[in-house]
Amino acid sequence: MTNALYQSSINSLPLLGHGKVRDNYAVGNDKLLIVTTDRLSAFDVIMGEPIPDKGRVLNQMANFWFRKLAHIVPNHETGIAPETVVAADEVEQVRGRAVVVKRLKPILVEAVVRGYLAGSGWKDYQATGKVCGIELPPGLQNAQKLPEPIFTPAAKAEMGEHDENISFAEVEARIGIALARQMREISIRLYKEAAEFAATRGIIIADTKFEFGLDDNGVLTLMDEVLTADSSRFWPADSYQVGTNPPSFDKQFVRDWLEAVRIDGKPWPKTAPAPKLPDDVIEKTAAKYREALTRLTGEELK
């Protein structure tokens, strides 16, 4: 497959680590180079095959939202071109898929906002009538819009482990009451503004995950990726129906295939190694990512 980068290899900068999708390098003491690869992770397991262009799509989408939402909260962007911090023979690895960002102290809580009942939120609700300890009205259906968006944080897990939904009280205990409340308020504001914009483009943002860090002055700063097809559930508004799982512009396609696949007659146990993705699943997933970018931002892949 062409246009695919499974793992970067930037030897001119110190490697800090490979995440599920991103490779991080140090740029001096106060900045990072983040390279978004074409790796795909589903159920917290990294697939063995890259999805062509996925990293560039995610990078362009995140940059679009960072600019659009900058009036709500500071973000990690520096405006430095990634091509200027690597060696000449490494430029192709970063072109269109990397950013140079401020080095922040990460807050180890995923700030999840849900406007609709879906995924693990729907499962929690079916079992308990609540999501992350938040009581919801009885009788809601799968994919139903919630009366108001809710903040349902998760504890950031180690690589390969599943993030765990936690209550707001637990977030307060972990990071302090004032910071927890600020994070909740900003996350809901970001979600509402993004959802309002996406609606004008015929897309429903069912839920999304934000990540924050603190800068040297202790200022809450938006980081990592924002409102991409990896960190959000995007549904086309024209085929949305309550009570069904709407087809989404993200890796749901891969998740559904993984749920259905049988290995030696048994379901895949959602642990590494992942089953080999068929070419048609890879191609359809790549097309979904590109379509999400165009539909949402009006931009073609640069």
UniProtKB/Swiss-Prot annotation:
Pathway: Purine metabolism; IMP biosynthesis via de novo pathway; 5-amino-1-(5-phospho-D-ribosyl)imidazole-4-carboxamide from 5-amino-1-(5-phospho-D-ribosyl)imidazole-4-carboxylate: step 1/2. GO terms for molecular function: ATP binding; phosphoribosylaminoimidazolesuccinocarboxamide synthase activity. InterPro entries: SAICAR_synt/ADE2_N, SAICAR_synth, SAICAR_synthetase_CS. Its EC number is 6.3.2.6. Keywords: ATP-binding, Ligase, Nucleotide-binding, Purine biosynthesis. It catalyses: 5-amino-1-(5-phospho-D-ribosyl)imidazole-4-carboxylate + L-aspartate + ATP = (2S)-2-[5-amino-1-(5-phospho-beta-D-ribosyl)imidazole-4-carboxamido]succinate + ADP + phosphate + 2 H(+). One of its GO terms (biological process) is 'de novo' IMP biosynthetic process. The keyword Chloroplast does not apply. One of its GO terms (cellular component) is cytoplasm. CDD domains: SAICAR_synt_Sc. The keyword Ribonucleoprotein does not apply. Belongs to the SAICAR synthetase family. NCBIfam families: PRK13961.1, purC. PANTHER family: PHOSPHORIBOSYLAMINOIMIDAZOLE-SUCCINOCARBOXAMIDE SYNTHASE. This is Phosphoribosylaminoimidazole-succinocarboxamide synthase. It comes from Cupriavidus taiwanensis (strain DSM 17343 / BCRC 17206 / CCUG 44338 / CIP 107171 / LMG 19424 / R1).
